[in-house]
Regions:
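Left-handed beta-helix
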Residues: 1-11, 198, 207-387
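Unchanged
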Residues: 1-253, 366, 384-387
Length: 387
């Protein structure tokens, strides 16, 4: 059964609300949880089900970071002579016009693939899904499409602008809208679908002929009255990473062991795979004080780290205090610096005795290689206050 399925993963355009982290990389390749990237979750979901033909469809964002991370796909068992992993540009160019060369290349991939059915995921939605069970339920339903959703509480605080779905008594999707923070509880779409390749190509071709091409979720919503869509309820942890705030929330949530076990498949056995880098163990010196934090290999810690995430190669000097921070790869936090609710992107230096603080709702982001100092921080705060 699985051999008849391929997977499509939409990587998501670089959302404006998360732009400080996507200036130099695709949204799907943003580091999370210390040693992982956002794309790892979608890729692992499909390969854990045995799918071995995966197409990644991206917008017009920078792809160097993504291609460096994925490589030939060996970590996900996708480095293969037949099938494997492929990266494509979407059919819209920078001016949002249909690009004929991209259309031809993308369609060739679908026609060349021998699988007759498709699992579609979107990388900005993070979860650990039993794709095998999803496929089984889809085939048992006899419907054209199966759409995955989750009953979400506090939908008035999270999942802004995510798709919401209305489901009738026969478990059929009868409405697709958008979550605008009006309801406390909502059925949120995971932007995950199962359908036949024939139906997907029909939706794509019809949209191209109409000059209204967009991602599959919007094509399905546009054609909802003529489609028979089964609803599949997902009950695990779900995070939509479409803003800096939600990115920060996800990292902080990973400090909760119950959530961490769910997302990384500790009990289910559905592991999350990532690119492995050979680095030495982290060195905790005598003055180090680390509490409730995720620390990757290759770090050197002399200061205090509380409720924080540290990626590979971070150096935390003596008398540093980090509280609720996300420190990405190869950052150097110098002696006496105090940071709270701060995201520090790769290759940054925070100078001695710097004091950087923000709120959990609006964490401060130090962009890649900025070598931040107090004057820059004060100028930013003055700008925000006077705006």
């Amino acid at each position: 059964m699985i051999r008849s399925y391929m997977a499509i993963i939409y990587l998501g355009d670089s959302k404006e609300n998360i732009s400080p982290l996507t200036k130099v990389r695709a949204l799907a390749s943003i580091p999370v949880g210390g040693s992982y990237r956002i794309i790892d979750f979608s890729l692992s979901n499909v390969v854990n089900a045995g799918i071995r033909n995966v197409g990644l469809f991206c917008g017009n964002e920078e792809l160097n970071s993504l291609t460096d991370h994925i490589g030939m796909g060996a970590e996900w068992d996708l480095a293969r002579k037949k099938d494997g992993i492929f990266i494509f540009k979407r059919m819209l160019d920078d001016n949002f016009s249909l690009n004929q060369a991209r259309i031809s290349k993308n369609m060739e991939y679908f026609f060349r693939s021998t699988q007759q059915n498709i699992v579609v995921l979107n990388a900005h939605m993070v979860y650990n899904l039993d794709v095998s069970d999803l496929i089984e339920k889809h085939e048992a339903s006899g419907k054209e499409i199966t759409m995955v959703y989750k009953k979400v509480k506090k939908a008035n605080e999270h999942f802004n602008h995510c798709s919401s779905v209305k489901i009738d008594e026969n478990n059929r999707v009868v409405g697709i809208g958008q979550n605008l923070f009006f309801k406390e509880e909502e059925n949120i779409s995971l932007d995950a679908f199962v359908l036949s390749k024939e139906l997907m190509l029909k939706l794509l071709v019809d949209s191209i002929q109409d000059g209204k091409y967009n991602v599959l979720s919007e094509l399905i919503a546009r054609n909802l009255p003529s489609l028979n869509i089964n609803a599949y309820e997902f009950k695990g942890y779900l995070q939509c990473i479409n803003s800096t705030r939600e990115y920060f929330n996800f990292n902080m949530n990973l400090l909760n062991q119950k959530i961490r076990d769910d997302v990384f498949g500790i009990k289910s056995g559905r592991k999350i795979f990532t690119k492995v880098k050979d680095t030495p163990p982290t060195l905790f010196k005598e003055t180090a004080d680390v509490e409730n934090s995720l620390v990757s290999n290759g770090c050197i810690i002399e200061g205090t780290v509380k409720n924080s995430i540290l990626s590979r190669g971070a150096i935390i000097e003596k008398d540093v205090v980090l509280e609720e921070c996300v420190i990405l790869q190869d950052c150097h936090i110098k002696k006496g610096a105090h940071l709270k609710n701060v995201i520090v992107d790769k290759n940054n230096i925070i100078h001695e005795n710097e004091k950087l603080s923000a709120s959990k709702e609006y964490p401060l982001v130090i962009e890649k290689s900025m070598k931040w100092d107090t004057k820059q921080y004060q100028d930013l705060m003055d700008y925000i206050r006077n705006k």
